[in-house]
Amino acid sequence: MDSFTYELLHPVKIDVLTPDSTVIVGDLESYEFANFMERNVNCIISLGREHRDVILRFRANGYDTGYQPVHLSGNRRAVYFPFEDVKLRRMSTINLDDVEIVATQIRMVMRGDTIVYNADAFQLSQGSMLDELVRKLPGVQLDGGRIMVNGRFVSSLLLNGENFFTGDPKVALDNLPAYMVDKVKVYDKSPEHDYITGKEVLDELPLVMDVQLKREYNTGWIANAEAGYGTHGRWLAQAFGLRFTDNTRLALFGNVNNINDTREPGTSGNWNSGWLANGLTDMRYGGVELLLKDKQDTWKLNSYVKGLYEGINHESKASAVNFLESGDTYQRIAKNSYMRRNKLISHHNLDLKYPQSYVNIKAYTEYADGNTDQLEQSAEFRDNPKEGYGHSILDTLFSSIKSEFVDRSLINGYSNAELARQRMFRGELKGEAYIKIGNLPDYVTVNFVGNYRNILNTSYSHYDLLSGNGGRSFQNRYSDHPEVRIDASPTVTYNLDLPVGEKKLRLIPSYKLKYNYNQGNRNYYRLDYLDGWNTADAAPELGQLPSNNSLMQAALDATNSYHSQQTTLSHLASLSVGYFLTDTRILAIRPQVHMQYDRLDYRRAHIDTVATRNYTSLGAALQFSDSDFKLTYGYTESKPTLLRLLDIRDDSNPLAIRLGNPDLKSTQAHQFDFHRYFTNEEKLRNITWRGEYNLYMNAIAQSLTYDPITGVRTYQPKNINGNWDAGSSVNITQALNEDRSLILTSNTGVNYNNSVDYVAIDGMNESTKSCVRSLRINEGASLSYYDLSLKGNVQWLHAESQRAGFETLNCFDFYYGLSGYLNIGSLELSTDFTVYSRRGYADKYMNDDNLVWNIRAERSFLPKSNLIVAIEGFDILGQLSNVQRTLNAQGLVETWYNSIPQYAMLRVIYRLNREPKKK
């Protein structure tokens, strides 16, 4: 490492000398792991057992030569011999040959398993944030903060190799300016403890996206602020500040807005109505993050605190058709709700690195409270009201106006005014330690996870139920539902490496103890049992309770109230056996035995029982993998919870009754997965092929008994067989020309699902088995050339069933369009055009075309372009609808939401950065 900056050096030449300076092995070169984080620099040295005392000589370009004596023990299994860090001094004078620098704008390169994107090669408007850059990266998909690269989910977003806001990508995506970014790397991240465990792992490494800042922003501070106002009362304001040094990072951000939208004009985001955010949201959130570490990287502290407020006004009106054998039923549903939620979250992470051990401690806390005020009205009919989603029929239903259609066709209807409140506190503590055993390759892992959760839910409800025979009942309901949950789980693992000729055998015995305690009560009151509380007109205002405790006890609904206390103690023993055929090719098997004790103390009306259970289940996993492929098989077995096995009846919702089932059996699952990777760095080709097959035995489905007279549905869990699914996907990223400016991305997927379930048959009392076979084929492609991008996607769904009354589906959903960026002097334009189409639907209104056009224009001011003014137009042609239609095997649902797809916004952005003074 550098003696001044403590930065690890690479490449480094290493020679092994005898004490009299005779060269034993020379010109060995260090190597980096595939994740390209500089701290992962190693060199493998193989020596005979006759060498006990040697001298290592280190040579790096631009540095003086360094030496380090090492004593090797005689233990035959010893492979690691630690010594102090070797610090190399920079040479005082360095003579360089003449070089010619040619500027290029290659957008992406591949280095082993790492994809490196050059941020400067992607043209973005001056005010762009990181999310707009990420959307333009070939092979990358961004959906509401979730990032997919070549079909794989990105688990964390890093900043200069370190977790940023605990890996929460949305903070960085929304607040980090794109102009600060130098490179974006995507790779499988080795764990922090790999210097203890080595780089050979049996489990799959997490995929991360590492945002590398430009050198001038690695030390100093930056800040930016933005404000905007638009049509329909849309507004936003946000601020972000970041302070960097080599060993510290401080970030602060704040954001208030009511736009409820994360998409940007000129990007590849989805703009069809199915992706519109539902409702109107007033959101306010902010946070602070602190990172501290020492130069030697022996300790690191990362803390993050975030506060959030949300106010959501949600309105919807739905028209539904329920497909039944002897005749469809028709529903009209209207909801109007306002939800308020506050949340405070904190994450803390401490890493401690010692020569022979690694310790990590994580702490997480969360506090949330909120309330929901909602009115829901619904009606189910035998005939179609044929008045769309105007829902005037609901107004007629709950008024004194008489309707011949309602009298003839109504099955049931209800109006439910509800006020709900929730308070929750959660705490979690995790600790893990990796301890190396002397000079051996063996190590011990000790892990602990502890959780505490305390939840209180309360709700008030005025429920008015109408029956098709003209009957009417009013329920004045109140419930409180406190719950306490405690989990504790220590794990001990020993990792043992044994030489087997030229190969290696890894044995990993593991033992895990898990304790779980869950206490949940529901006190359910029918206030309509009391005089003066039993009619909609006379009942006190929603949210009030009787002041007399005896009245509360008189209103207690014992049938739907309960006390539940569950305790679980489980032991999980496993043995992983990995046979290393080569350094990368591994054959592994992991059998496991799970022994569990369950105890349930449950009291409810006529039930007062203590149920206990001891059982043993088996599991297994097989894996055959190499650097470019992986084949896995897994078997799991799970028991139904004791609560599901109780013979109970819950009719707190008079139209949806739920039963237990003492006859439930264990569920078994078989899972097969195949991954194959093809890469060609020279041609910039990346192909990922995946396949999977899943078989479920004794799966638990919800059996449904339907009463066609009253419309009451009774649900009961039952075991069912015949469920399985299979799928395959191919993701391709390929440069089509020599300078890599023309890049093709293709995502092809085929999925087959054999779904066996219980469905209601109109006119019959019992559910019958139904098998629906569905085939879904999807092809999506994009072609990008500098600042222009073409995109298209087509999805075909075929579903069939032998169930009487089932209509075979053959539906196409597809879109095509283009997006681009244009610089006209000081004016920057970003725009996108996309046509969304549907074909093959029985409902003619679903076979439609929508042209969506969005545009953004901006201009920068001041000498350093610190001030930016932008105007955005969303859905300029006004073809996006806030009506969504969904068709599946169970029915057709058409829903209107109070979203605003079309609007314009003026935004003003100011940014400031200060670099340290050059010495």
Residue map of PLM features:
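Short, acidic, small-residue-rich periplasmic hinge/interaction motif at the N-terminus
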Residues: 4, 15-19, 57-61, 80-123, ...
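Periplasmic plug
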Residues: 146-194, 208-213
